[in-house]
Amino acid sequence: MKHPVRRLAALLLGLTLWTVPAAAVETQPASEDLTALMEDFRAEYGLNEGNFSLCYYNTVTGEEYRYNDTKFMIAASTYKLPLNMYYYEMEAAGEISSATMIGATTLADAHYQSLVWSNNDVSIDMLYNLGNFRTYKNTMKQYFTMPDEEIDSIYYADNYYCTSMMLDTLKHLYEGGDKFDEMIDYMKQAQPGEYFKLYVTDYEIAHKYGYYVDDGVTAINDTGIIYTPQPFLLAVYTSDAPG
């Protein structure tokens, strides 16, 4: 059985291609078709609130589906999504230069290494260039709609995020205009034929994936923009999920 992260983009692609666009783009509740599709998918893979979290958003119809989206889980390398986005915004505002040294390399190269190759050492240098770990986590919160009182303390202590936060980040990225063109291009280059890209070959995908194995825990995650005729945003976290 293939891991669920690798099948989800293709599964939702099929639904998106035959959905008739709505006139408005405000957030809409999930259709009965989408809800049933996701229920069947979870049952097939043995997915539950202990091992699976998902957020889906259709940028054309506004349809949104969430499952277990506020559960904080090991983010693996998906933390690099809001981290890089923040630096691109600082560059656009003239607050930092792409030639600024981040550790042993320039910020321009750090973006490439972090987003295309998911270089951990470079990304950690980017993180601590902002200050200590708490400062970095507080800085990232500007992209999230989750109220402070709902954010679990583990968020501040370790590399934990939730898919609700990742969906907020993807929305900001998708709607952010020219300042994110390079970032999206790098995300399109990353990991061809893997994660969301395994079964979706006819449409571009800009994604930031994450893979973590340690202490008996395996996290396989992906977050991205799938550029179908109705582009959709997808964030999926797993923890020891079957497949």
Task: Give the positions of each predicted feature.
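Active-site SXXK
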Residues: 62, 72-102, 114, 234
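Active-site helix/loop module of the DD-peptidase/beta-lactamase fold
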Residues: 95-117, 137-149
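Bacterial N-terminal signal peptides
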Residues: 11-19
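Aromatic- and histidine-enriched alpha-helix N-cap/loop-to-helix transition segments
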Residues: 76-82, 117, 158-164
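Sec-dependent signal peptide cleavage junction
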Residues: 18-29
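Penicillin-recognizing serine hydrolase domain
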Residues: 28-61, 65-66, 122-243
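Bacterial N-terminal signal peptides that target proteins for export
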Residues: 1-9
